[in-house]
Swiss-Prot record:
InterPro entries: FAD/NAD-bd_sf (IPR036188), MnmG-rel (IPR002218), MnmG-rel_CS (IPR020595), MnmG_N (IPR040131), TrmFO (IPR004417). Catalyzes the folate-dependent formation of 5-methyl-uridine at position 54 (M-5-U54) in all tRNAs. The keyword Lipid metabolism does not apply. One of its GO terms (biological process) is tRNA methylation. Its cofactor is FAD. It catalyses: uridine(54) in tRNA + (6R)-5,10-methylene-5,6,7,8-tetrahydrofolate + NADH + H(+) = 5-methyluridine(54) in tRNA + (6S)-5,6,7,8-tetrahydrofolate + NAD(+); uridine(54) in tRNA + (6R)-5,10-methylene-5,6,7,8-tetrahydrofolate + NADPH + H(+) = 5-methyluridine(54) in tRNA + (6S)-5,6,7,8-tetrahydrofolate + NADP(+). The lineage of its organism: Bacteria, Pseudomonadati, Pseudomonadota, Alphaproteobacteria, Hyphomicrobiales. It comes from Bartonella bacilliformis (strain ATCC 35685 / KC583 / Herrer 020/F12,63). It is found in: Cytoplasm. Its EC number is 2.1.1.74. This is Methylenetetrahydrofolate--tRNA-(uracil-5-)-methyltransferase TrmFO.
């Protein structure tokens, strides 16, 4: 009986997943030791020693729980008393219908919450291997797992981790943006958490400027990665220049789409493309370039991005960069409670399991924490229904194979939460014959959301 021995649960990695897992376990009255290698050892992307540091965007994406899958996941996490969502809500900044946060305030809130919890001990040390006398362990080291621990994980799992490139976008000082050219507006004037409908700074481009910009992206000098040349990108975080290579019009229909925006300086002139900047901190002194993750050389970033109208004199607080992410072939090696089949005392959580995104990583950390707590109390974990966002995401990780028709081989890819992961629903009761396609699609999503929230509430109530 592990609980009678009063042994703590060990969590390796103080990112989003590890922080959330620690909180969930401690809130259930179980001691936790959280191991974090920073500041003893920094990764190639981290800049601070704070827990739950956001290394890429400051956005948790849409907070619309009625029609958006990630917004639904937000809602379920709030129901489960998530620390990550509590910290995000406390540090939100204007971002239209999205939930974006002051990244420093957010990580500070998480760090202080964990440091002040009487059942959580934080050890600042790098873990090179997993001690045999640790009987209940969650590995939440994320996509930037240190080489030594990655090797230890590979040795235990008996399989090579898969990898892909991930990139981060530049951040600009607000006072260096030319507001005689740019203007404040959220797409379609949407008002979200902490927002006003004027939460983004917009930079307009005409057709000639846009095409010149695309060519500059293609021609710009990129950082070369000899060691990782054959590692693919994750489609949800493609470098801007890679998107430009896919076609001249790609960016106009992606992060630079002009729809739903009107230039307040010249309202009768429709922009051909628009670059959006999103507030990055509560003070409003920093804005990040939405969708502009890049592997361009630093000097090229400054030169090319200053050709964007309104950014001619832009000063950069941080330039974009690129790092390697790793994830496991989870459906092969993990069971339904995220335990390693070969070594059940080990459980994995977060992005290393093959989920993609801040919220998804935190959600899997939440589940892993609750599963580990149940095991500590000698009960089999109660799985979230597959009809919930929690359950849909967990099911993808533990059984989300894609069979390729060409080779008939099983393939597992990182995935954001989306409605395609949910079981089908009979939405005829929510639809009328007179509805158009978009209306029927909306009604179906709302039916999925209603079912998910009801099932999630019942599941959580059953855990009490």
């Amino acid at each position: 009986m592990l609980n009678k021995l009063n042994l703590p649960i060990h969590i390796i990695g103080g990112g989003l997943a590890g922080s959330e897992a620690s909180w969930q376990i401690a809130q259930l009255g179980i001691p936790v030791i959280l191991h974090e290698m920073r500041p003893q050892r920094l990764s190639e992307a981290h800049k601070t020693d704070k827990l739950a540091e956001l290394v890429c965007s400051n956005s948790f994406r849409s907070d619309d729980s009625l029609t958006n899958a990630v917004g639904l996941l937000h809602a379920e996490m709030r129901l489960a008393k998530s620390l990550i969502m509590k910290a995000a809500d406390a540090n939100k900044v204007p971002a239209g219908s999205a939930l974006a946060v002051d990244r420093d305030g957010f990580s500070q809130t998480v760090t202080e919450s964990l440091e002040n919890h009487p059942l959580i001990t934080i050890k600042r040390e790098e873990i090179h291997d997993i001690p045999e006398n640790w009987h209940n362990v969650i590995i939440a080291t994320g996509p930037l797992t240190s080489p030594a621990l990655a090797y230890a994980i590979q040795a235990v799992t008996g399989t090579e981790a898969l990898s892909f490139f991930d990139a981060i976008a530049p951040i600009i000082y607000t006072d260096s943006i030319n507001m005689n050219i740019c203007w404040y507006q959220s797409r379609y004037d949407k008002i979200g958490p902490g927002g006003t409908g004027k939460d983004y700074i917009n930079c307009p481009l005409d057709k000639e400027q846009y095409e010149a910009f695309i060519q500059a992206l293609k021609d710009g000098e990129k950082i070369e990665f000899r060691e990782f040349e054959n590692v693919p990108y994750f489609d949800g975080c493609l470098p801007i220049e890679v998107m430009a290579e896919r076609g001249v019009e790609t960016l106009r229909h992606g992060p630079m789409k002009p729809m739903g925006l009107t230039n307040t300086h010249t309202p009768k002139v429709k922009a051909y493309a628009i670059v959006q900047l999103r507030q990055d901190n509560m003070l409003g002194t920093l804005y990040n370039m939405v969708g502009f993750q890049t592997k361009l050389k630093y000097s090229e970033q400054v030169r090319i991005f200053r050709t964007i109208p309104g950014l001619e004199k832009a000063e950069f607080a941080r330039l974009g960069g690129l790092h390697r992410n790793t994830y496991l072939d989870s459906p092969t090696i993990l069971d339904e409670t995220l335990r390693l089949k070969k070594k059940p005392q080990l459980r994995f959580a977060g992005q290393i399991t093959g989920c993609e995104g801040y919220v998804e990583s935190s959600a899997i950390g939440l589940l892993a924490g609750r599963f580990a707590a149940a095991e500590y109390n000698n009960t089999y974990p109660s799985l979230p229904p597959k009809t919930t966002a929690f359950g849909a995401l967990l099911n993808h990780i533990t059984s989300g194979y894609i069979v390729t028709q060409e080779t008939e081989k099983h393939s597992f890819q990182p995935m954001n939460i989306n409605f395609g992961l949910f079981p089908p629903i009979d939405s005829t009761n929510h639809q009328r014959k007179t509805m158009q396609y978009k209306e029927k699609k909306l009604a179906k999503r709302q039916a999925i959301v209603e079912r998910a929230l009801n099932d999630c509430t019942q599941w959580l109530n059953g855990l009490k």
